[in-house]
Amino acid sequence: MPTSSISFVSPANHARAHSSRRIAWWLFAAFQFFYLLTSTGRVRTPDEYNTLYTTESLVLRGSTAVPQAVELHNFYGRYDLHNRPRAAYPPGQALLCIPWYAFGQYLLARLPGVPADDADLVVAFSSCLSSATFSALTVAFFFLFLVGIGIPARASLFAAAMVGLGTPIFAYSGWLFSEPLSAAIFVGVALLLFGRGHAPIAWRSASIAGLVLGLATLVRPTNALAIPVFALAVLVRDGKPALRAAFILCATSAIGVLALLAHNALLFGGPFEFGYPTAAESAKRLNTFDTPLVKGLYGFLLSPGKSIFVFAPPLILALAGLRRLWKLERGAATMATLLPLVYLFFFARYTQWEGGYCVGPRYMVPSIVLLCLALGPMLAGNAAPFSAARTNAARIKKIALLLLVLGALVQCVSLATSFMEDQVPRGRYYDANWTYRLSYSLSGQIHLLWKYLASGEPARLGLGWDRWFVFLHKGGVSAATLAVVGLIMLAGLGISVAGLARNGRCAS
């Protein structure tokens, strides 16, 4: 009897896993093409520019020094021991952006209809598309995780759509910040550790997870906050037998952390000497922790311009699902609860907690995605007490749909026009002392949206509709070339959505 049972169940599980992987591939492709179409394709902040400059230096000069940033009066970083300018952030994101930069430099910039003077615009556009890929990868990993812990495919797809459309992962897919990459790393590690069944975590999985988390500090040093949280989640999940896996995770993560510290020591003279400048506008010190905790918490939770609930409405339902997630997968529930809390209290004290010029709670974006993992159990509708009544399950889905629509509207407003056009005028986003104004809200971007909807006059380059095809056309790229690129993206989106629908029906 046991033998026949095993031989029957195993092929079914294998077929289910294979079907889920197919759906994930189509889901990734659909969001990839969707994010490509909706991308701004522009870099505008010092953070984005200096990542682009580092990538450019790596491709063209084999160096991470950014002399071009100094020449263009757009340098944000420090001079190293040899008096060479270095960007503020480690080179992790820049290294991973190399394929997109090279694609723009050696292919897109040489297309017919692209003037030689516009090569820099086209290369920046191509580099920015890396965020679309990282965001799409986040959504695909998110879906695979939920299926892996037993959530039905349809509910997992719905939850993935809520994250991909209703949270800042959508908005940040259009800019060159590091948050989409960090989110993809965290969800990918969660999938590796907790999304592949209830068996104890193997040492190989723990070692790979630790290595990836350690190397993630080369993308952003604060990603180190995730290492102890994931290790603790492993212990909570499997108890004392998981001590070895937790230790291996921490030990292998040390490889990436040591690489970061060695990078700092070689360039700046000390392991804890990072590339951040000591001060920015008006000599204001940015990288300290002098924000009152209450102010930072208010900003992230309740302020109109940075609240996680304003910019990620699905979190409201996710919070209600944490208990269900705990019943399904304790390690995931621990991680989904603790990492957002760690990020919240850490960045609430950070001087520049608002994230500089940006949309919404930038620093919270990767942890927001992890908290949204609790959406899956809520949408599955198979846990007490809600499963006892279909009306309750239907009500939850209606609430989820409403939150998805609200979140998508917020992201669309955020992406429609350049946030810099709204935030740069003095007194709107920052006060005279370069302190973030807690009264700031999306009302300015909503006003810009209506302004450009009502106006038939084309805006200057960098203003108006913040879409790649708009600003590239203003820059001189021919309409025919842009139409061909856009049609390829539209065709890819259509094929991907059709494939996703077909495979989704089969799975259901």
PLM features: residue spans?
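Membrane-proximal envelope and lipid/glycan-remodeling enzymes
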Residues: 1-508
